[in-house]
């Protein structure tokens, strides 16, 4: 079956799950993460078929995969993201995308859909990236005096390391070069990470643009939530579904299987039990009562 039609068949089901998740979640503005993933062993060299690369939307507050679009390679994410955003109701949400998706047309599409964005900046954004970095570095020299900046700091310990993150959000200066590139641009920001691993210290700075107004905790939450698609969704697909090991090489079948993997993960994530996703999959095989409750998002 055509992958787009196949996903459309799940629309009502997914809407029902999303409504239930919204009732359980107290987030006023849910964060939707957009990111790509390569299905590493889905290539077929004999027939000159490259590995499948997919782009999906993960609602981190709801633990739901809301849609997926396949591309031939990672470089095609720029064209896949607009198509994906058209498939999903993103109204009132905060959309987070890495630097590849920081494009004028994508920012406009998000704002036109009555959503907000937090988009990563890297060197490929040229003038805008350089202007944001320069403005923030100059502001750091004066400890952000007179910039209207707001800060929020978090500390985490685990996996043999200590990490302190400082989130800084600033209003967009009127003279910022390249500011007209992105519709609705209101704030810029940086996350400065200081990491201590066994006495070895390192630091990192990541820059962002956003249509959000000032509110540094909301800004920080959106950035932190973006990692959920990698740490929760993609990790489970690789470790539990073994997606990277799949040798399905038929175009339509591998796309539809990719969506089924994401949808079944979403179903299991709705169960409030403390067991791992792998154990919940086993419960579906062992316990018919559990199995019949999972599809409606009411597993107990």
Language-model-derived ranges and their functions:
Residues 35, 117, 230:
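Residue-level signature of catalytic and energy-coupling elements of molecular machines
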Residues 4, 8, 12, 179-188, ...:
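Charged, often Cys/His-bearing segments associated with DNA-binding zinc-finger transcription factors
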Residues 118, 122-225:
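An anionic, glycine-rich sequence signature occurring as long contiguous blocks
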Residues 3, 86, 115, 137, ...:
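Generic secondary-structure signature for well-ordered alpha-helical cores
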Residues 209, 213-248:
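Short amphipathic alpha-helical "interface-anchor" segments enriched in bulky aromatics
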Residues 1-97, 102-105, 274, 286:
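Conserved, well-structured functional cores that handle cations and Mg-NTP chemistry
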Residues 145, 236-300:
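A short, flexible helix-boundary coil/loop motif
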Residues 107-115:
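Short, surface-exposed basic-aromatic patches at helix termini and helix-loop junctions that form
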